[in-house]
């Protein structure tokens, strides 16, 4: 953290008072600042087959409270939770870029999410732009075939948690097949995640990591849809405009019952 203040001299060279102190923070500027390891959550790799999202977790201890910063990125898109609370409102982190040249990492202030004593971090990671159907003509695996995360938690500049082989992972969670273009499958029966197994450390390097230099994608507005019934008996929800977002709705159903929601920019 860098602290600064200013003072001015007028046209008569008379010096004014110092301003109030302000400060800014410096992220991880050099490869050697990273002590975390890239970790791969998957046991099996079938590049041409769609895989479910992965869940990674780790319990850790915090001795003293302080200014806590979580540095994190992924091969894929991720969400991070500490003690059940989301670390950020960033949607589709780490964002899109030419990953082989620049992969952005994010810095989150998680001071208010930590407890003195026992804590748990959970990270979900899915295909995203890394290996989803986002290439020209729907080509998969544009940047690689293996998902991975890299994260490092510091409190008052002291490292208290890193991603390494001590983490556990599972593919038996509610978010199954997931793709930015093809959609996702969510199975609420699997919300109690099970079948945890060890992760694998990978030597993916740090040379392409850069601090996040773009605006976060966050929720901005909510739209209430208008329900329409077609002559064929289909239910259509019209939001009245083209948007980038997702749908929230409630319903009554039995375990195992399937509800399919199709998205489209126009109606046939």
Language model regions located:
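Extracellular/oxidizing-compartment recognition motifs
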Residues: 1-268
């Amino acid at each position: 953290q860098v602290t600064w203040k200013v003072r001015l001299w007028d046209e008569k060279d008379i010096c004014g008072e110092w301003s109030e102190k302000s400060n800014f923070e410096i992220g991880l500027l050099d490869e050697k600042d990273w002590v975390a390891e890239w970790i791969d959550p998957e046991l099996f790799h079938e590049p041409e087959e769609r895989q479910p999202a992965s869940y990674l977790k780790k319990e850790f201890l915090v001795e003293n409270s302080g200014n806590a910063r979580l540095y994190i990125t992924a091969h894929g898109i991720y969400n991070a939770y500490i003690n059940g609370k989301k670390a950020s409102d960033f949607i589709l982190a780490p964002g899109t870029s030419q990953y082989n040249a620049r992969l952005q990492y994010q810095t989150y202030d998680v001071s208010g999410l930590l407890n003195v004593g026992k804590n748990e971090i959970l990270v979900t990671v899915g295909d995203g732009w890394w290996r989803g159907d986002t290439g020209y003509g729907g080509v998969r695996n544009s940047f690689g075939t293996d998902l991975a995360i890299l994260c490092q938690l510091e409190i008052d500049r002291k490292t208290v948690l890193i991603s390494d082989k001590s983490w556990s992972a599972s593919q038996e969670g509610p978010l199954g097949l997931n793709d930015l273009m093809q959609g996702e499958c969510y199975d609420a029966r699997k919300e109690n995640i099970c079948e945890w197994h060890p992760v694998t450390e990978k030597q993916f390097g740090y040379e392409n990591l850069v601090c996040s230099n773009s605006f976060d994608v966050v929720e901005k507005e909510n739209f209430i849809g208008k329900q329409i019934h077609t002559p064929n008996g289909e239910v259509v929800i019209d939001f009245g405009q083209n948007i980038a977002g997702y749908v929230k709705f409630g319903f009554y159903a039995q375990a195992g019952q399937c509800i399919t929601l199709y998205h489209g920019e126009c109606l046939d």
